[in-house]
Amino acid sequence: MAVKSSTVDVRAALQSAGAHYMNLIEFGILKVFIDHQIFDHIPAEGSISVTDLATRTKAEVSLLQRFSDYLVASEVLASPAPHELAHTTRSLSYRSEEIAAGFVSHVYHFFLRPMATWTAYFEENGLREPKDAKTIPLGLATGHPEEDLYGVLDKEPRLAYMFNVAQARSAAIFPMKGLYDFAWLREALEDHIGAESPAIVDIGGSHGLALKELLAENPFIPSKRCAVLDFPQTVEQAQQNLDEDLRDIHFIGGSMLEPLPVALHAAGIYQFRRVLSDFVDKDIILALEQVRRVCAPYSRVLIIEELVKASRDKFAIAQDISVLNFGGKRRSEADWHQLASQAGLQVRHVFEQTETAFAVVELGLA
């Protein structure tokens, strides 16, 4: 009986651990299929033989058969006949231009690759969160162990492109409509914000898509009095593919960790939208200090992020752990109070979406 019980225990243990193993196998195959556009060459309707698919994608038939067997077994692909493959609803979402395909690639580069260095990283730095932006798992994984996130992106153009695409898409995922009332800015622009001062400065605003959404919902804000501050290479990219609605916006190259250009002083609003969670505490304090130094008495600083709550779901926790790879961290309302205070600012209001953890934390001069 003891032997039988032991066998059952081993099987149960392997079944539990094996589930993680199989998830990794599936993820790895998905990444290969996405990289080589295998899903794109399967007809949206009907089926294709593995041999024909291998010819179209310049793949070895035997390897493609092994990989596709797994995706059929996991119901990602269908096999209407032996050695035939067809799409399912799931697999259609992994074609090149689909969001899911981009997400898989993003997770691989910004989470799985750095995660593979965790053993070495924690052995060297101790079992603690990154405290220095230039000592991060992502740097270790990409062969740039002394670079921060943006130093890595500067040396890895492909990763930079993927990161910027993800940042741009996040504007649509977390719309601000109805969350924060910009009506006060209308009166401020008319009464006491000087004509030479910006209405809104979007710090880390990338291609300006979040600002575009904001201006569409608040047409009283003159676009010519708005600015985006981001790294010079990001600004250059943005200006090469500028949306027509953003032609009047000023795109300025720079860093939030350095003194802000004079043209950005005394703005009505300084906005950090899904930016600060990518940074370690000391850099957030420095960025807020740089803004505080150029604030006018009427200026407001908006931090737009997901707030950590005790009730957050598994996916939100996963995102928090993922940004650890480049020194980032999701933070609670109490965390923002503390960071603002250390930068000489104070939290005035917190506006939250009831259905998500998305919030606007409004700061002013202390």
UniProtKB/Swiss-Prot annotation:
The keyword Transferase applies. GO terms for molecular function: O-methyltransferase activity. S-adenosyl-L-methionine binds at residues 204-205, 230, 255-256, 273-274. Its EC number is 2.1.1.-. Transmembrane segments: none annotated. InterPro entries: COMT-like, O_MeTrfase_dom, SAM-dependent_MTases_sf, WH-like_DNA-bd_sf, WH_DNA-bd_sf. It holds the Pfam family Methyltransf_2. SUPFAM superfamilies: S-adenosyl-L-methionine-dependent methyltransferases (SSF53335), Winged helix' DNA-binding domain (SSF46785). Disruption phenotype: Impairs the production of phomasetin but accumulates N-desmethylphomasetin. Keywords: Methyltransferase, S-adenosyl-L-methionine, Transferase. PROSITE patterns: SAM_OMT_II. GO terms for biological process: methylation; secondary metabolite biosynthetic process. Pathway: Secondary metabolite biosynthesis. Methyltransferase; part of the gene cluster that mediates the biosynthesis of the trans-fused decalin-containing tetramic acid phomasetin, the stereochemical opposite of the HIV-1 integrase inhibitor equisetin. The PKS module of phm1 together with the enoylreductase phm4 catalyze the formation of the polyketide unit which is then conjugated to L-serine by the condensation domain of the phm1 NRPS module. Activity of the Dieckmann cyclase domain (RED) of phm1 results in release of the Dieckmann product intermediate. Belongs to the class I-like SAM-binding methyltransferase superfamily. Cation-independent O-methyltransferase family. This is Methyltransferase phm5.
